[in-house]
Amino acid sequence: MVASEPVKRLFEEYEKAFSALDIGRSARFFADTFISAGPNGTITNSKTELLKSASQAADFYRSVGQKSAKILSLDEQPVSEQYSLVKVHWGVTFEKTGKRLTEFDVSYLMQKIGPEPKIILFIAHQDEQKAMQELGLLKD
């Protein structure tokens, strides 16, 4: 992991929350307002909305059989004193795929103002729905 200590600590905790499908706990790492982006577009979110949909999101990942999530690599690139771009290479296991890791990348723009860094933007590099369909995880 190539990252500052505060960012490293944040992602160590975020990894635990994501692996446990504790979306409510994951929400604490996000700014009050943030942007989600991916191959299909962008949306703005609030932490309040994320918390409201937390159980639904966790239920979805359980329904496709997610068993674990692990950060395989993490690289932080400073943008300015207050911001950095963090690229995370994730490995996730599913019931259907056994111990074989499904790997994907997400980039996070971190705001480092205040006592802890916060995620203000995340960009999924791959189409999650398409990848899950290819793995046979989604029902038609």
Describe each region flagged by the PLM.
Residues I71-Q77, W90-V92, D105-Q111:
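Hydrophobic/aromatic beta-strand elements that line small-molecule binding cavities or substrate pockets
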Residues M1-D32, T48, L137-D140:
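Short, low-complexity N-terminal intrinsically disordered segments enriched in polar/charged residues
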Residues F30, V79-S80, K96, I113:
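Structural motif
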Residues I23-E76, Q82:
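A solvent-exposed, acidic/Ser-Thr-rich amphipathic alpha-helical stretch
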Residues S36-A37, V86, I119-L121:
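Short hydrophobic/aromatic-rich beta-strand segments that constitute the beta-sheet cores
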Residues E103-L137:
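Short beta-strand edge/turn micro-motifs at domain boundaries
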